[in-house]
Amino acid sequence: MSLHYYLFIFWILAFVQFSHATYQYEVRMCVVGKSTPQNTYGYGSKRVGRYGIYGDCGCFQKPVGCPRLWYPQYNKACAPMDHWINIPQKQTQLEEVTNWRTATVEEVQRTPLETWNVERTPVETWNLQKNQQGPHSVVKSKVYKKSVYNAKRKVKSLYTKTKKTYAKPVKKYKTIEVITYRKVKVEHIQCCPPLKFWFFDFPDFVEVSDANGNGAKSTNEQFSK
């Protein structure tokens, strides 16, 4: 066996160990990051999302991608996470307000009045004739009608002016601001910190506390969930 053969075998084993260690690192760092406070490993809070330093492997929005020196989680150790956020929006609306204003208007009205009109009304009278002379004479009388003046009432109309007061509606518009919320879906991708070339492995049991301090949990137990 030559030296080149041993070097080739050593290179193959190192490559396999490197791939296994990298995969284990990606899986377990994702699991540990779920229950680890944000700045445990020395990363600033400006580069990470709102869900912690690893943020369930879904730290950043899709258009932004992973930050500089970070790399995507290709092994799909943790599923990407989508959530909905409500964005407040201000809108201006007009509200109709009705006020009542008192107004006085002068109107012309037709008022009936009683007046008197004099007319000639015929009345029956008697006219006596003289007796005729002779053996066959009789007394004759003739009745005729004579006109007299009589008073009769007649109704006429007269125009008068009156004042009328009433309430008039006046419409105005008042500007009000209304806040509405628009739902926006935020899609996250899987990102991991730039520790890709740290070739160490975690033990089978790692005691970590979650962000709320609810005690220690094992990484294997979390990963199985």
Swiss-Prot record:
Superkingdom assignment: Eukaryota
Subcellular location: Secreted
Secretion signal, residue range per the UniProt entry: 1-21
This protein's UniProt keywords: Secreted, Signal
Protein name in UniProt: Uncharacterized shell protein 2
GO cellular component, one term: extracellular region
Main location per the UniProt record: secreted
Tissues showing expression: Prismatic layer of shell (at protein level).
